[in-house]
């Protein structure tokens, strides 16, 4: 029996474009906040890393809090769309604030400014926006194939935006005056673009009626499904092993991304050409986009996500090992590094494309086992993963830079720093890919749901 389809092509494209807005924030922040703070503002990378880690203490609570709020929201726009729309206004304001730290402030005030703006962006506004955006996967369609297609469109836009930002930002900062003024102007431009695209994405889709989502029109039954407090929500999530697997995987992916962002330092201080960071960005993002184009077809051909995810990430792990080998062979092996980087990205693509569908399957698992609809709360793993993983990754890079005696005033870094940059950019990404591959080999949520439905 063919599943009912709910979406037109323009709904999928409109939804996917929302990650242009998300990556205007995330790609810009994760790729450039550390080098902006150390080389332009003059802050200590170790202290910055510690402040980011302190900020992350709030994230786990706010993720579950906003996910629960979304589940309990009833409005003309639906459950998630209001949070996606209004949350981004705060994202735009705080993004500009982070890249507009006054240079005439005392250093203590600069650290405080960064901590407040960074915490508001991540723990409040980005949380509300991103959880709502991700939850729409389960709120605008019940068709699993469409959910995979939505994920593919979403991450095609995400990686294209990331590629563009990583490729043009340093040049744009220089063209717009350089220094603090250049960074501030670029942040304002990105924030305006993100605000416009996010608004268009919100109004490109409509949520399904709540009765259709839970297969009942009984309002009391719907309300009963939503009766749980914050502690109960946390227990529902913790009791779903597949949610925990996805959450850990998401966090590891974002730490991986933070390490890859060290390419700005690697290209500058080891390869001797900061513009090579943009070339490596192409080697990462173009293969990811190509993989995403074919992900829905491959999922359908292989009757599910499991085999595709495990096999493709195994390829990614092997390729990252070869990137490390080429990197340690010397700076003359840039071509080999680019080749294996591209193959690794190709292997990572399918999981990026079907991840949201996997989360929807996790939500279905909770419904089948606990009889609670927790779509918004379930998608908290996307926001939690991005913020906790990305923040922790950025904090770790700051600590490691400080521990290796990085000095932004030096054109040539000490050998301790060069060795650490190689570990961060070559070794750690390989290790993270290996761990993710192992977790994906255990993530048999589709099979579990089929058994539960058969037993019902």
What do the PLM-derived regions correspond to, one by one?
Residues 2-456:
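Membrane-embedded alpha-helical bundles of multi-pass transporters/translocases
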């Amino acid at each position: 029996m063919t599943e009912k389809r709910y979406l037109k092509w323009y709904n999928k494209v409109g939804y996917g474009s929302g990650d242009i807005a998300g990556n205007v924030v995330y790609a810009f922040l994760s790729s450039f906040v550390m080098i902006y703070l150390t080389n332009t503002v003059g802050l200590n990378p170790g202290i910055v890393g510690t402040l980011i880690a302190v900020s992350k203490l709030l994230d786990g609570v706010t993720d579950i809090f906003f996910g629960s709020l979304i589940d309990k929201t009833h409005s003309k726009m639906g459950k998630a769309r209001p949070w996606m729309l209004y949350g981004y206004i705060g994202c735009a304001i705080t993004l500009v604030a982070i890249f507009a730290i006054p240079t005439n402030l005392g250093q203590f005030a600069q650290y405080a400014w960064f901590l407040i703006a960074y915490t508001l962006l991540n723990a409040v506004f980005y949380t509300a926006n991103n959880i709502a955006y991700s939850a729409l996967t389960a709120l605008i369609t019940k068709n699993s194939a469409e959910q995979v297609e939505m994920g593919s469109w979403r991450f095609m836009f995400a990686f294209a935006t990331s590629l563009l930002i990583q490729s043009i930002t340093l040049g744009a900062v220089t063209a717009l005056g350089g220094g603090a003024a250049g960074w501030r102007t670029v942040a304002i431009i990105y924030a305006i673009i993100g605000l416009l695209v996010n608004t268009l994405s919100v109004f490109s889709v409509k949520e399904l009626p709540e009765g259709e989502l839970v297969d009942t029109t009984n309002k009391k039954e719907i309300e009963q499904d939503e009766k749980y407090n914050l502690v109960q929500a946390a227990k529902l999530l913790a009791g779903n092993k597949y949610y925990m697997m996805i959450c850990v995987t998401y966090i590891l992916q974002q730490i991986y991304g933070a390490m890859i962002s060290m390419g700005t330092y690697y290209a500058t201080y080891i390869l001797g050409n900061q513009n090579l960071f943009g070339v490596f960005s192409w080697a990462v993002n173009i293969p990811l986009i190509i993989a995403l184009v074919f992900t829905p077809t491959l999922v359908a051909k292989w009757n599910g996500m499991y085999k595709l995810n495990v096999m493709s990430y195994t390829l990614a792990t092997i390729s990252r090992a070869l990137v490390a080998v080429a990197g340690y062979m010397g700076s003359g092996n840039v071509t080999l590094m680019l080749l294996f980087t591209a193959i690794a990205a190709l292997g990572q693509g399918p999981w990026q494309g079907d991840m949201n569908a996997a989360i929807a399957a996790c939500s279905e698992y909770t419904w089948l086992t606990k009889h609670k609809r927790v779509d918004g709360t379930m998608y908290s793993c996307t926001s939690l993963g991005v913020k906790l993983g990305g923040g922790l990754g950025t904090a770790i890079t700051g600590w490691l830079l400080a521990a290796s005696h990085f000095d932004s005033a030096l054109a040539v870094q000490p050998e301790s720093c060069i060795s650490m940059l190689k570990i961060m950019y070559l070794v750690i990404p390989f290790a993270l890919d290996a761990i993710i591959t192992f977790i994906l080999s255990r993530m048999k949520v589709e099979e579990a749901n089929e058994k539960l439905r058969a037993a019902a």
